[in-house]
Design a protein with these regions (language model features):
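Short acidic, gly/pro-rich beta-turn/loop elements at beta-sheet edges
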Residues: 57, 95, 112, 137, ...
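OB-fold/S1-family RNA-binding modules
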Residues: 1-49, 70-99, 126, 134, ...
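Short N-terminal signal/transit or membrane-insertion segments
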Residues: 15-25, 60-70, 104, 108-111, ...
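Short, acidic/hydrophobic/Gly-rich beta-strand patch recurrent on exposed beta strands
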Residues: 46-50, 55-59, 100-105, 138-142, ...
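A cross-kingdom feature marking solvent-exposed beta-strand/loop segments within repeated
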Residues: 53-77, 109-115, 119-120, 146-168, ...
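Surface-exposed interaction/gating patches
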Residues: 119-149, 157, 178-180, 190-232, ...
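DE-rich acidic low-complexity regions and acidic surface loops
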Residues: 20-22, 110-119, 190-205, 270-278
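A short acidic, glycine/proline-enriched capping/turn motif at secondary-structure boundaries
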Residues: 54, 62-63, 83, 89-95, ...
Length: 304
């Protein structure tokens, strides 16, 4: 079975016309998705399955809830979002109505065993952004299992917060950077192109749009693409995140430098743009960002 981030496989979203249909799904160990309607006082999640109501008991809500390594906010935050689960069995409520007892943790354990545990550094997978913190982006790498992209692995161009690069709910591709017994760390920047891949889109004499990323005494760093920035001369009344129009003065591959002139600054701040991926392979062993003739070599070796 192929595992997806929650909410990204429409084939799993189902309702059932009868309890018998749901029992068949249980027998077949079928993975189902439905929107979480409620997280009750005991932090059980409730879903509507059509024929019956379904409940995911707190301890079945996610890997790590039982040992405290995952906090209950991981359950509370799923309200009004699609979640995956298996059917464990059935009980009766006080009104003698059938209730389906479900497990999200069971699907996550299966995802770990059949998919995530088999990944090796350099593997490229699909993910979904779940939430953003100052230090990085949390992503769903399959069945609601979360992992982190540290902020410095989101792009070569430096940003002050992941919201400048990504948005919650966004589908992205990521590459496994480091695998440890208790966690996996992912990266995005190796998929967004080398210096040359990005620089070839800009020609001296052109005027293009960019985003102010850093203001220093000696100049202003302007992002032209997530993996490419140029330097403009100092200018007053700019702010980090501001959109600007810049004139491309020169492109110098051996120094990995692009000289810019700020033509106009706009009052609005930048919003994340759709990402362009330069790598289509599902696995990479080595990524060299810098040109071969550059005096400074920047690379990632996924076999280290």
């Amino acid at each position: 079975m192929k595992f997806y981030p929650e909410g990204k496989n429409p084939d799993l979203l189902k309702t059932f016309d009868s309890v018998d249909e749901l029992k068949m799904a249980m027998i077949n160990n079928e993975v189902i998705e439905s929107k979480a309607l409620l997280c009750d006082r005991e932090h059980n999640l409730h879903v509507d399955l059509g024929a019956v109501r379904g409940i995911i008991p707190r301890l079945e809500g996610a890997i790590g809830i039982d040992d405290g390594s995952v906090r209950d906010i991981a359950l509370i935050s799923k309200v009004n979002k699609r979640i995956c689960f298996n059917v464990l069995g059935f009980e009766k409520d006080i009104y003698d109505n059938s209730i389906a007892i479900l497990s999200r943790k069971a699907v996550q354990l299966r995802c770990m065993e059949e998919y995530l545990n088999r990944l090796v550094p350099g593997d490229v997978i699909d993910a979904s952004v779940t939430h953003l913190e100052k230090f990085g982006a949390f992503i769903d790498i399959g069945a609601g299992v979360n992992a982190l992209i540290p902020i410095d692995m989101l792009s070569v161009s430096r940003i002050s917060h992941p919201k400048e690069r990504l948005s919650e709910g966004q589908s992205i591709k990521v590459v496994l950077r480091k695998k440890e017994p208790s966690k996996m760390t992912f990266s995005l920047k190796e998929l967004l192109g080398t210096w040359e891949d990005n620089a070839k889109n800009f020609t001296p004499g052109e005027t293009v749009t960019g985003v102010v990323r850093s203001i220093e005494d000696y100049g202003v760093f302007v992002e032209l693409a997530p993996n490419l920035a140029g330097l403009a001369e100092p200018q007053n009344n700019l702010f980090v995140g501001q959109q600007v129009a810049v004139y491309v003065k020169s492109v110098i591959p051996e120094k990995m430098k692009i000289k810019l002139v700020i033509v106009e600054a706009f009052s609005d701040a930048d919003v994340p743009k759709e990402l362009t991926y330069y790598i289509e392979d599902r696995h990479i062993d080595y990524f060299r960002y810098s040109p071969q003739n550059s005096s400074k070599q920047i690379f990632t070796d996924f076999n280290e």
